[in-house]
Curated annotation (Swiss-Prot):
The keyword Transferase applies. Catalyzes the decarboxylative condensation of pimeloyl-[acyl-carrier protein] and L-alanine to produce 8-amino-7-oxononanoate (AON), [acyl-carrier protein], and carbon dioxide. It comes from Bacillus velezensis (strain DSM 23117 / BGSC 10A6 / LMG 26770 / FZB42). Homodimer. InterPro entries: Aminotrans_II_pyridoxalP_BS (IPR001917), Aminotransferase_I/II_large (IPR004839), AON_synthase_class-II (IPR050087), AONS_Archaea/Proteobacteria (IPR004723), PyrdxlP-dep_Trfase (IPR015424), PyrdxlP-dep_Trfase_major (IPR015421), PyrdxlP-dep_Trfase_small (IPR015422). This is Putative 8-amino-7-oxononanoate synthase 2.
């Protein structure tokens, strides 16, 4: 069999299972294939990616430093904007220091592949993001998975590994597919009791949770040993970061391969991100309005009979069941002007395919009415939840 023939056979199996994926082209923020759409799948929770203040900051930095960084941070790619942003992130996360990565994915891999060592053990939540899973696979430490936000199971497993050199608990702050919040206060208490270090990935919590938008640390009033995050969601730009002690950041700068061998973020992105953090701390009313929209949508969908999950976050998973029905539901929603793609295995467990809604701060009551009316219509057309 030739190379392409072999791959086509594998792709055919993916198609038969209803898991085939394609790209869609966004012509503007509101149009797909020339038609106006309401996008309910964006991670731009606070609408900052379109904020003129961020755009102006990026343009100003680009005119001075150029379109790209031209190298790694350790060679020629380090600018004043990279360092200013790292100081801002550290202040925002209430840590001593921070270090930028080209994405949140690379931040997780860089931390987990370099920090735990042979003889150590990582205790990882069952629903952690793929970047955490991959980072654990690259680590020299053993990984033990505990049941999703099950503190009794975590404690049982912590108690069983007391003979190991070091214990690391790694968790998403907000889980991207379920919208649930890790009980970080209880995790920190267990870590203290069983002498473990805590690594929290705050990708979906930064800017959204907590009085000042500081994430799960702000929400629970605790401080993990390591905080990982991304700039590509509520911050409205792109890139990732790790935050913690000065010594930890110095360690990453010398040991994290995904930092050492990456091309630095463009200075324009750093300037825009720096501006975003200045704005986020003052968006108290925006966060409250966002929470109000989330509660309204969840209540309406649940009243229709949909199985709705999620915590106090902008992520609303609407469980459909099998993958093919979820794809059909997404297609019908799109015909009604609602862009909300189906999420299927391997991103979620078998039998739990879903429409994953994300609510952003720019949603009006009319938008919410149109969304919930569309869901009521597809429920009847597909005989969902009957």
């Amino acid at each position: 069999m030739d190379f392409d023939g072999w791959l086509l056979g594998r792709l055919d199996a993916v198609k038969r299972d209803g898991l085939y994926r394609t790209l869609r082209t966004q012509e503007t923020a509101l149009k797909t294939k020339g038609q106006k759409r309401q996008t309910w799948a964006s991670n731009d929770y606070l609408g900052l990616s379109k904020d003129e203040r961020l755009i102006t900051a990026a343009q100003t930095a680009m005119s001075r430093f150029g379109a790209g960084s031209g190298g790694s941070r350790l060679t020629t790619g380090n600018t004043v904007w990279h360092e200013k942003l790292e100081h801002t992130i550290a202040d925002f996360k209430q840590t001593e220091a921070a270090l930028l990565f080209s994405s949140g994915y690379l931040a997780n891999i860089g931390v987990l592949a370099s920090l735990p060592q042979k003889g150590d053990v990582i205790l990882s939540d069952q629903l952690n993001h793929a970047s955490i899973v991959d980072g654990c696979r690259l680590s020299k430490a053993e990984t033990i998975v505990y049941r999703h936000i099950d503190m009794a199971d975590l404690e049982k497993k912590l108690a069983s590994v007391q003979a190991r050199n070091r214990r690391f608990i790694v968790t998403d702050g907000v889980f991207s597919m379920d919208g649930t919040i890790a009980p970080l206060d209880r995790i920190m208490a267990l870590a203290k009791q069983y002498q473990a270090f805590v690594i929290a990935d705050d990708a979906h919590a930064t800017g959204v949770l907590g009085e000042n938008g500081g994430g799960t640390s702000d929400y629970f009033g605790v401080c993990p040993d390591v905080v990982i995050g991304t700039l590509s969601k509520a911050v409205g730009t792109e890139g990732g970061f790790a935050a913690g002690s000065n010594i930890f950041i110095d360690f990453l700068l010398n040991q994290a391969r995904t930092f050492i061998f990456q091309t630095a973020l463009p200075p324009s992105i750093c300037a825009a991100s720096h501006t975003a953090f200045d704005i986020i701390s003052d968006m108290h009313d925006t966060r409250r309005e966002l929470q109000s929209s989330v509660k309204m949508i969840k209540t309406r969908l649940a009243d229709m009979g949909f199985t709705v999950r999620g915590g106090d976050t902008p992520i609303i998973p609407v469980i459909i069941g099998d993958a093919k029905t979820a794809v059909s539901a997404a297609a019908l929603l799109e015909k009604k002007g609602i862009c909300a793609p189906a999420i299927r295995p391997p991103a979620v467990p078998e039998g739990e395919s879903r429409i994953r809604l994300t609510v952003t701060a720019d949603r009006s009551l009319q938008d919410i009415d149109e969304l919930t009316e569309a869901f009521d219509s597809i429920r009847k057309e597909l005989n969902i939840n009957k």
